Amino acid sequence: MTPAARRWPAAGGVVGPVAFAAAWAVLGRRQAGYSPISDAISQLAATDAPTRAGMTAGLALLGTGLPLYAVALRRVVPGPGWAAAATTGACSLAVAALPLPASGDRPAHAVAAVLGYASLAAVPLLAATPFARRMGAGWKAPSRLAGAVCGTCLAATTLGPASGLLQRAGLAVGHGWIAASAVALLRRQDGGSA
């Protein structure tokens, strides 16, 4: 397999999270009455939201990028971390396909979101030791910390009025770890040092 062919799946771990974060950051500023401190990102993709198309596109890019990243992770790093990455990607696509209604809740959306959060926090936790073995010992502690912070922030979204901020913090840490590890995989596949 050529280096370019090995490179593009890992790039999904950068492109997907960056596109998703850009979508919620830009669209959240544009939607009147929306608060990134107290409102969930899913509200930007709700059936009645004027930002629905853009936020759904961001979710779709995340949902396709993460399974590609999972392929690259599986090629280099043993263990179940890749499966957690693929799961969070699939859950992102499910969240996009099951938008919040104009009023009320959508239980299937909530289930997809919770599974997506749990699998996102699991990626760095499950990959910590094998990733450190392959890519350098310096990855182990930060990977565990990223998984713990991601999971804690996302679990804390149920506790109070700053749920939007906690959601963004948890997602930023989890997606940030994925993007950093994807860059390390890209460098390794090109023959560079990790």
Question: Which residues are covered by each model-predicted region?
Answer:
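Beta-rich carbohydrate-recognition and catalytic domains
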Residues: G192-A194
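Hydrophobic, aromatic-enriched alpha-helical segments typical of multi-pass transmembrane helices
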Residues: A4-A40, L44, D48-R187
